[in-house]
Regions:
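Sec-dependent N-terminal signal peptides
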Residues: 1-4
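N-terminal leader/targeting segments and the immediate start of mature chains
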Residues: 7-52, 65, 197, 202-206
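Gly/Pro-enriched, hydrophobic low-complexity segments
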Residues: 123-125, 129-198, 202-206
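Beta-turn initiation residues at beta-strand->coil junctions
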Residues: 44-46, 71, 87-88, 164-167
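An acidic-aromatic
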Residues: 57-104, 173
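Flexible, surface-exposed loop/linker segments and immediately adjacent secondary-structure boundaries
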Residues: 98-131
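Short, surface-exposed charged micro-motifs
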Residues: 57-59, 74-75, 119, 148-152
C-alpha cells in the first residue's frame, strides 16, 4: 500500500501559486481548522498506469494536529508527538517522529504541504460525484516521486470532494470523500496508541 505514502524531496525550484486556487485552499483550510474535530469516510482507490484497479474503504479523524487514518488493515495514528503505523496483516507496529516521508495520503494532507512544496494552478470547474467542483492542480517544486496531484473541492461548502495523486512511476491513488462530519464527541483515547492492545505484534521504534 505504498502508493499513499508521500515521498521525500529532492532538488528545489521557484514556487508558483495561482491566487484564485490559493484563496480556495486557504478558505477550506480555515474551515476545517475552525472545527473541534472532523471525520471523513472515503473510498481509497489505487492502481498502475493511471488506472484505479483496487478500491478500499477508509476513515480519517482529525482534531488539531492529531489524527487517525485507517485504510483496510493499515492504520496510522499521530498523537501530536509520534506517528504509529499499525499493520494488522503483518502484525507489526512502527513508531517514529513525524517527517515528510512518513505522512500517509489523507483527505487533507495537501492543504498543508501545498504551501511550500507545490506549484498550484486553477483549472476551472468539473462535475465530480454530483458536485460542480473547483479543479486545482499541484505539481511538485522538488522531485518527490509525485508527477502531479488533482484536488477537486466544493468552494461553496469549503470542503474537499476528491483527490488524485499520480506518481512519476505511473502509480495512482485516489480518495473520494463519501461522508463528512464535524464537532463530534470523540472517545478521549481516539488518538492514543495503547501497547496493551498489540501484545502479539512486533513493535519497532525508529
Amino acid at each position: 500500500m505504498g502508493s499513499f505514502v508521500v515521498g521525500a524531496v529532492g532538488m528545489a525550484n521557484a514556487q508558483k501559486i495561482d491566487a484564485k486556487a490559493k484563496k480556495i485552499l486557504d478558505d477550506i483550510t480555515a474551515n476545517y481548522n475552525s472545527k473541534k474535530n472532523s471525520y471523513f469516510k472515503f473510498s481509497f482507490g489505487s492502481g498502475l498506469n493511471g488506472q484505479v484497479t483496487k478500491t478500499e474503504p477508509g476513515i480519517y479523524y482529525v482534531a488539531g494536529e492529531k489524527y487517525k487514518l485507517k485504510i483496510m488493515d493499515t492504520e496510522q495514528i499521530f498523537d501530536g508527538s509520534k506517528i504509529y503505523n499499525i499493520n494488522a496483516d503483518d502484525m507489526e507496529v512502527t513508531i517514529a517522529k513525524p517527517n515528510g516521508s512518513s505522512t500517509m495520503f489523507s483527505p487533507i494532507n495537501y492543504l498543508t504541504t501545498y504551501r511550500n512544496d507545490y506549484n498550484v494552478t486553477y483549472n476551472g470547474k468539473k462535475m465530480v460525484n454530483g458536485v460542480n467542483a473547483d479543479f486545482i492542480k499541484l505539481t511538485p517544486v522538488k522531485t518527490n516521486g509525485i508527477k502531479y496531484v488533482y484536488l477537486f473541492v466544493d468552494s461553496v461548502k469549503k470542503q474537499m470532494v476528491k483527490l488524485e495523486q499520480h506518481g512519476t512511476n505511473k502509480d495512482v491513488a485516489v480518495i473520494a470523500i463519501k461522508e463528512y462530519k464535524e464537532n463530534q464527541e470523540l472517545d478521549p483515547n481516539m488518538f492514543v496508541f495503547d501497547k496493551n492492545k498489540f501484545k502479539n505484534y512486533i513493535i519497532t521504534e525508529l
